[in-house]
Amino acid sequence: SKERSKPLHIVSCSFGKDSLATILLALEHGEPLDEAVYCEVMFDKTISGEVPEHRDFIYHTAIPKLERMGVKARVLRAEKTYVDLFTGTVTRGPKKGMLRAFPICGKCYVQRDCKIRPFRQYQRTLPPDTVQYIGIAHDEWERLLRLTGQQVSLLEKYHFTEEDAKQLCRKAGL
């Protein structure tokens, strides 16, 4: 079997301006990029939890355009949906046995179970030296300070602010 000589490079992609600008910068500057990984939160088994206009943009504009540029897009989904979580019961802690109902801002089990968990499960299938590009702008210092290990912001590397990211996406038709 052939040994892999270079680490994989993936973009965590929400299809917002910062993650799309990260992809565009990688392409523009010849940065290694193996795939864009998007984790779609589903409302139920058939309906996306994304705002319909954003979902349409993702599937009908962004993914096809990225694939034409040579960027593979991978879509992850959790086994559980928003409805599963909303109607489920708490399994641990002082509220054990109670219905979950509406998620509490800042303690959002939907983010944890429908976005972070499937992404982490996927990450475990990747080599440990995989580099993860994160779309955090040059002017978002508090967020940049939270980057760890193999996480890299190309927006920071190339001194792109959120406004610069927006303009880059607009120029690219994204």
Spans of model-derived segments:
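Nucleotide-activated chemistry modules centered on ATP-dependent adenylation/adenylyltransferase
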Residues: 1-174
